Amino acid sequence: MHVIGLISGTSVDGIDAALVDLSGTSLDLQVELLAAHTYPYSEPVRSQIISLCKGEAIPLAELALLDEAIAQEFAQAALEIQQGQPAAELIGSHGQTVYHRPVIGNTPAYTLQLGRGAIIAQQTGLPTITNFRVADTNAGGEGAPLVSRIDICLFSHPQQRRCVQNIGGIANLTYLPPLSDVAQIGVGVQGWDTGPGNSLLDLAVQYLSGGRQAYDDKGNWAAQGTPCQALVEQWLSHPYFEQAPPKSTGRELFGWDYLQTCLRDAEPYHLSAEDFLATLTELTAASIVLNYRQFLPALPDQVLLCGGGVRNHYLKQRLATLLTPIPVLSTNEVGLSADAKEAIAFAVLGYWRYLGLPGNVPAVTGARREVLLGELHTYP
């Protein structure tokens, strides 16, 4: 089945689209990537999303218009990714997260993604699955991470323990025990958000460059600096890093306000811009490793990286150094595009919903049971 996956992550760097040919349903899942591309948001839409993610208030009427505008741009991405390719039969669209509240005591998680599925279905003429996270939160889960079931199907190894480490705006992991140890799908699998990924680094670059630079290309700016280990240790004492999984987070915790805290913490050290950025990059790498050492049943035999962080060579180098001697590869090296992996994942989740198959892993999200993820919109 030809399916389009669409997502814009917490970095808000554009709409990632993937057109894939899918077959199989579980460990027999086969994925062929036919096309992948990132389509930048129009600047007015991107600016509004970033303002909203910073916690700035906007009138309800503007929120409604933004919801529709995001859907229009997602629909356009779905139309463009099909050019010169086989026609798609289905769309799985994550939308744009603008708010995520994890489970807090007896208060359930809440998550809000914009980009109406009905509009995407109408504009493309394709059945569209959206709003994937709500069924999991309604079952008592965090609503995140949702990619773990895909990771099980695509990256499980007969003998090796693997960690699939996504570094998007927020970093998250899936721990996969050897298949020889798994009696049924999901048993022994763990996953959670480890903490900040690219979005905090992007915010820092935008602040330090006075808005002239959106992100640290290949990590070259941070690579010119030296991490302040005292600051890294201070930041690693944040309660989130000590919280046992299942857990999830977002810009609400590691966003603009957190960056301002980090800048204040750094003042006594008189760091250069390069040193500050190197220190923040070290926080992302060190927090990932801390999560492994604190909460995994055993360290992995291999780490597979995916997401935009794969393009940050300095971050990848620091993570590999901190994990020595564990090999750190990208999913490119085992046959799946690291850049397109999240878009591929939501194509698969949409496909499973269309087939009436569950998409969450309760051991990862904390949900009480497996559930069908997403809402189906058809047109006409």
Curated annotation (Swiss-Prot):
Keywords of the record, alphabetical order, are: ATP-binding, Carbohydrate metabolism, Kinase, Nucleotide-binding, Transferase
User: According to its UniProt record, in which pathway does this protein act?
Assistant: Amino-sugar metabolism; 1,6-anhydro-N-acetylmuramate degradation; Cell wall biogenesis; peptidoglycan recycling
GO BP: any one term? 1,6-anhydro-N-acetyl-beta-muramic acid catabolic process
Q: What class of enzyme is it?
A: transferase
- The residues that the entry says bind ATP are 9-16
Q: Which Pfam families match?
A: AnmK
Q: Which GO terms describe its molecular function?
A: ATP binding; kinase activity; phosphotransferase activity, alcohol group as acceptor
Which InterPro entries does this chain map to?
Anhydro_N_Ac-Mur_kinase, ATPase_NBD
Q: Which reaction does it catalyse?
A: 1,6-anhydro-N-acetyl-beta-muramate + ATP + H2O = N-acetyl-D-muramate 6-phosphate + ADP + H(+)
Q: What is its EC number?
A: 2.7.1.170
Query: Which family does the UniProt entry place this protein in?
Result: Belongs to the anhydro-N-acetylmuramic acid kinase family.
Task: Outline what the protein does.
Answer: Catalyzes the specific phosphorylation of 1,6-anhydro-N-acetylmuramic acid (anhMurNAc) with the simultaneous cleavage of the 1,6-anhydro ring, generating MurNAc-6-P. Is required for the utilization of anhMurNAc either imported from the medium or derived from its own cell wall murein, and thus plays a role in cell wall recycling.
Which named protein is this? Anhydro-N-acetylmuramic acid kinase
Species of the source: Cyanothece sp. (strain PCC 7425 / ATCC 29141)
